[in-house]
Amino acid sequence: MSEDTAVTPTNRPVPVKESQSTVSALLSSAAGRNTGLVVALVLLCLAGVVTAGDRFADVDNVLTILRLAAVIGVVSVGMTFVITGGGIDLSVGAIVALSSVWATTLATQGLANSTHWIVMVFTALAVGGACGLVNGVLIAYGRVVAFIATLASLAAARGLAEIISNRKTQIVNVPGFAAFFDASVLGVPVLVVIFAVVAAAGWVLLNRTTFGRRTFAVGGNPEAARLAGIDVRRHTVLLYTLLGLCCGLAAVMLIARTTTGSATHGGLYELDAIAAVVIGGTLLSGGRGTIAGTVFGVLIFTTLSNVFTLNNLSISAQAVAKGAIIVVAVLLQQRLARRSGV
Amino acid sequence: MPHKRTTRLVAALTLGVALTACTGNTPQNTQSGDKGGVKVANDEPGKKVVIGFSAPAADHGWMAAITNAAKAEAGKYSDVELRVVEGTNDVNLQISQVETFINDKVDAIVLLPFDGAALTPVALKAMKAGITVINVDRQFDSPFAARSTVLGDNHGMGVSAGTYICEKLKGRSDAVVAEIAGIDSLPLTQDRSKGFAEALANCGLKVSNRVAAEFTVESGEKAAANLLQAARKIDAIWNHDDDQGVGVTAAIKNSGRSEFFMVGGAGSANVMREIKADNGSHKATVVYPSTQGADGIRLARLAVQGKSLGDLVEVEVPRQVELYAPVVTKENVDRYLPTAFES
């Protein structure tokens, strides 16, 4: 039944026979899609340079864009795995909130102060991973549709975050923690380095390992994957746990950026992450995914937001532009899918 | 125009600085004439000031009015260039907006943070970069993060509302008083409720029924409908927020009840018009100025240009300005209507 849940794509099954040829077609079209994304990003940057000149092309401004992209970027890389595996996770923002709160309680901070700040990092990762595990088990073994299971987690995790924090903002007073994450490596902020490492690791994991191949198989056709000897349920649990860990890491980054943990952190991150993944070229129905595309997707949205900020543009125009980009990306995707699928 | 400004700056202000402790909030009116000269001096165009402005998403009337009032205020000065960025409830995004201002080397940043504590690190960074940061409404958790802070008086709102209800219900110790709070998690809501309870206790009353909404029309309707079900008879209701009050009023109309009077909060124009017309359940509202951002713009300009606050003897802009929370009734509504916000 995990098959059923994982497979939204029953209307467009990938024939097992053709999988070889589709893989090669996929590779080429994926490259093509990435070219499109690069072009889009370059156009955006051109728009930035033309409208804002030196203010846009400044090193500090580029770092500002990257720092903004880092937190949501880590979540989006994890989301790429889940969506490629035929799932969806609406609870990522809530998991970020819960992890950030749990890692900044007085108890955790006290422990961190008496031992080492890394305690906070492990706490956030453990909480995020556990949430992902619960999601995965509910979906794979509890046979709850992913959309519903993670919708429930969204409500529950944010509620729990509010209970733990008593709906207050928790301020971090662990000196080593702030010092570590505020630092730069060769001029690149640590947060950006973390994003780069996560993206690189994600790319290797998805494209160069058995785990990655299984993810494509499970997302493309779970039944075929099962017949091929893949433990689809176990793999589904792993995918959601991986995303949970990414959320925990994103929470650590957000704590570092804000020096706080709060139940309001990560608001609507699920939409931002899914949007970045989808415009990156990963199919919402599963079976195809690209980490590079996701990274470009995140960068396109954050650059867009930056260009709008620099140009003093209205509060609502940016949302309209974002919506338009998503629609264009999905329309393009459907055309590509039709061409290669049928 | 000078008169309007005086009203806002002097009349409705409590100056929360030590050096003004002697003057307090006493100068209510009568000052517009003799101090006019000082104000004109301050209004003279000085060196160009670039101000960055960032606030949370304009998802209710009060918050929208904050940004609009700030823009309007900046428009009055030829020496102010205001850069307004998209209002957001995502602290990660708001931090990057402030970083952009720092990169741009603006002269001042007027910041109404979504979460004061979360925006503190980046505000500190801006101050270290030599930028004058003016903190509005929601306070940072470090005194070094802002040159000056403009605050509304949430506790005072509760006190004002409670005191007014005490006066109206004089001598009735069995009166049923209900409270419709805003977002319960926010410290500002807790402050308002605390002040309200204290003022009521002062005259032997207490809050009999309390519900919480979320500053939105929809949540106000829901909370009020529940409240009216829970309490068969009510004498007075204090609703924290006039934006959610639109929903509260709708729920009251649906219930057909009218045995009580209502006191609003924040001070929206439509509630003030209702008070003026005296044709609804609102008999009063307590102001939480939506012109705080505009005051922030003025303070930023003065601080950067090295000018002083006109009516003070002190030559520097104060560290903190806490605005007063007056009760608006039919008698004095005309004074507050011009600066009220549309919800």
Show where each model-derived region lies.
Chain B
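Extracytoplasmic "Venus flytrap"
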Residues: 33-77, 82-100, 106, 112-116, ...
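Structural motif
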Residues: 82-105, 209-231, 245
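An alpha-beta-alpha
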Residues: 55-59, 70, 159-205, 209-210, ...
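Hydrophobic alpha-helical
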Residues: 111-128, 196, 213-273
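Hinge/cleft segment of the Venus flytrap/periplasmic-binding protein
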Residues: 11, 23-24, 31-49, 180, ...
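C-terminal motif of bacterial Sec signal peptides marking the signal peptidase cleavage site
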Residues: 18-21
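Flexible loop/hinge segments that line or gate small-molecule binding clefts
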Residues: 117-156, 176, 269-281
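Hydrophobic alpha-helical segments within soluble ligand-binding/sensing domains
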Residues: 94, 150-175, 219-221, 267-272, ...
